[in-house]
Amino acid sequence: MKPKEVLEKWIDCFSKADAYHIAELYATNAVNHQVANDPIIGKESIYKMFVNEFATAKMVCMVENIFEDGEWAIMEWKDSLGLRGCGFFHVKDNKIVFQRGYWDKLSFLKQHNLPIE
C-alpha cells in the first residue's frame, strides 16, 4: 500500500473510534508524537492511548487535504467543533513507523469540557 492508502485506512478506523484496527496500522516499535503530549512508543502503548482517547471524547476527523511524498502521508484536518490540525505519517512496509500531530490542546480540552492540565 502507498502511504496515502495507509492514512485513508487510519482515517476510517479513527472515524469509527476503532482502537484495535487503528493500532494494527502501526509497526511494533512505532512512535506517535502528538506535540502537545509526550511521544507514545510501541504499538501496544499506541493502542492503549487510542482506547483512552476514544473513551474520553468523541473525536471527528474531517479531512481537508491529503498529500503524499515518498514514504510520507500528510493530512490537514478539522473537526466538527472547529479544531484544526495536521498529521505527518511515515510509512514503511505498509505500517506507520512514526506519526507527528499538531493541534491546539487547550482548545480541544475546552471544547470537550475536559480538565485543563
Name each region found by the language model:
Residues 9-12, 36, 98:
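Short, flexible active-site loop motifs that bind/organize anionic cofactors or intermediates
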